[in-house]
Amino acid sequence: MREYTSKKELKEEIEKKYEKYDAEFETISESQKDEKVETVDRTPSENLSYQLGWVNLLLEWEAKEIAGYNVETPAPGYKWNNLGGLYQSFYKKYGIYSIKEQRAKLREAVNEVYKWISTLSDDELFQAGNRKWATTKAMWPVYKWIHINTVAPFTNFRGKIRKWKRLVPEEQRIKRRKI
């Protein structure tokens, strides 16, 4: 996993990966948001919903701990060794929105991550053990949790949506958009 030496470096990497990820949705029509393609595990809407789910959970964990609540990770009723149901809850919660709305919501959530990073001290961000919700057997510092819920999936899921787009040629996507 990538190491970061400053808040600025982390925020710049999130922004770079997010912008590339988000741009992939420019040529996907609303009529195709739920279109399944063989060999790609998520529809465009599910792809965005997954990102929205994890980024918002990350922000929720922090907000709850700061407010004095005991945080149950990954989410109440879900376990780390069985995340399929959690993913389905993301698809249900965010899949009701259009691609445009999902993209806007993700942009808002990513902006909240930037603001949050700015509020953290270097110790809170880069030293393990500063947040109960981040204190697992792995003893990761908060920045690693931010990385695995932003940079890593923006990178990996960009590849998945690119594959989806290769299997649904642009001419077909444009033609369907006009209909």
UniProtKB/Swiss-Prot annotation:
Pfam families: DUF1706. Its main location: cytoplasm. One of its GO terms (cellular component) is cytoplasm. Keywords: Cytoplasm, Nucleus. It comes from the Eukaryota. Signal peptide: none annotated. This is Uncharacterized protein IRC4. It comes from Saccharomyces cerevisiae (strain ATCC 204508 / S288c).
